[in-house]
Curated annotation (Swiss-Prot):
Residues 127-144 have a biased composition (Basic and acidic residues). Keywords: Ribonucleoprotein, Ribosomal protein. This is Small ribosomal subunit protein bS16. Belongs to the bacterial ribosomal protein bS16 family. It comes from Salinispora tropica (strain ATCC BAA-916 / DSM 44818 / JCM 13857 / NBRC 105044 / CNB-440). The gene is rpsP. Residues 111-121 have a biased composition (Low complexity). It comes from the Bacteria.
Amino acid sequence: MAVKIRLLRMGKIRNPQYRIVIADSRTKRDGRAIEFVGIYQPKHDPSVIEVKSDRVQYWLSVGAQPSEAVQRLLEKTGDWQKFKGLPAPEPLKVAPERVDRKAAYEAEAKAAAGLAEAPTKPAKKAAKAEAAPKTDEAAPKTEEQAGAGSGEQG
């Protein structure tokens, strides 16, 4: 059985994502695979290439032939040079870590709060909060007055 290492296309229209697979050379491009050994996402900047190096080395050692596209990917990751005994290529470009949007928003909010010092209550809520204690204090006074008035009558 002739075994190939090739790309299996996934993803949407105009957004290709590939899996690097080990497959029989007679199967169709997106057909059944023997093993999945990596992923390739060309639309990301820099493009994502993840390869299970030990499995690729095994399949190359037992005679699997990489397609042209997969061979170029293996050259970028250094797996092809490792198989052929050549010096390793320069390291891949790594994407900078993304800033968490929520954390950035909270940092901006804290900075804005520092400028405004203490956050104030909206006018309506503040008015309701002040009005509520006055009604509680007013209620006992009216009961005392009512009790004093009823004592005079009784």
